[in-house]
């Protein structure tokens, strides 16, 4: 079993599709079909085999597990998470990050005082949005760009933003 630190979440089963045990897979890879080119494992580190059937008109992946053949079996998989080993992923460029590495990352102001953490990373189609949870437990959505986050390391992110500006 691999520790969750060594696993990167790359997909989640959204729902079943049809009567033959197919599932709709929400892929977090870019492009989305790249998920089927990776060796996938579950949370316990056990190998998972899926086959891509097609990509639908919404861009979702229709897939099938080797050992799932009915709609009822597929329906039970809703929310099932798929991971790949961190070691199997390509080396990242200097300003690239895996979402899992940014979640809960401390956020500092320009004086290096902790002011909150990254709660979530969202994308609604126009670019990544960072959900920031401040120390007072309030949250704000901010664009993920160099203007707002000029410095990001594996240990912290600097936020260039005064809360009363917006």
From Swiss-Prot:
Would the keyword Repeat turn up in this protein's UniProt record? Answer: no
Keywords of this entry = Chaperone, Cytoplasm, Ribosome biogenesis, rRNA processing
Write down the Gene3D superfamilies for this protein, in alphabetical order. Answer: PRC-barrel domain, RimM
Q: Where in the numbering of this chain does the PRC barrel domain appear?
A: 94-166
Location comes to: Cytoplasm
GO cellular-component terms in the record?
cytoplasm; ribosome
An annotated GO BP: rRNA processing
Q: Which residues form a coiled coil?
A: none
What InterPro entries has UniProt attached to this entry? Answer: PRC-brl_dom, PRC_barrel-like_sf, RimM, RimM_N, RimM_N_sf, Transl_B-barrel_sf
Q: What is its main location?
A: cytoplasm
Task: Indicate whether Zinc-finger appears among the record's keywords.
Answer: no
Say which domain of life the source belongs to.
Bacteria
Q: Which residues form the signal peptide?
A: none
GO terms assigned for molecular function: ribosome binding
Q: What is known of its domains?
A: The PRC barrel domain binds ribosomal protein uS19.
Function statement:
An accessory protein needed during the final step in the assembly of 30S ribosomal subunit, possibly for assembly of the head region. Essential for efficient processing of 16S rRNA. May be needed both before and after RbfA during the maturation of 16S rRNA. It has affinity for free ribosomal 30S subunits but not for 70S ribosomes.
Subunit structure, as described in the record:
Binds ribosomal protein uS19.
> Which HAMAP family does this chain map to?
Ribosome_mat_RimM
Q: Which family does it belong to?
A: Belongs to the RimM family.
Q: What is this protein called?
A: Ribosome maturation factor RimM
Q: Provide the species name.
A: Rickettsia bellii (strain RML369-C)
Q: Which gene encodes it?
A: rimM
């Amino acid at each position: 079993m691999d520790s969750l630190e060594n696993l990167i979440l790359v997909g989640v089963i959204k729902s079943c599709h049809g009567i033959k045990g197919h599932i709709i897979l929400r892929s977090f890879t870019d492009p989305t079909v790249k998920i089927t080119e990776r060796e996938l494992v579950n949370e316990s580190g056990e190998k998972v085999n899926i086959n891509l059937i097609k990509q639908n008109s919404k861009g979702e992946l229709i897939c099938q597990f080797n050992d799932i053949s009915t709609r009822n079996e597929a329906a039970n998989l809703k929310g099932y998470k798929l991971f790949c080993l961190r070691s199997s992923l390509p080396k990242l460029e200097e300003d690239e990050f895996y979402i899992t590495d940014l979640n809960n990352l401390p956020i500092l102001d320009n004086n290096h005082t902790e002011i909150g953490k990254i709660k979530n990373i969202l994308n609604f189609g126009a670019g990544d949005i960072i959900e920031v949870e401040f120390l007072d437990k309030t949250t704000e959505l901010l664009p993920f760009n160099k203007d707002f986050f000029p410095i990001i390391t594996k240990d912290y992110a600097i936020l260039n933003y005064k809360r009363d500006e917006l």
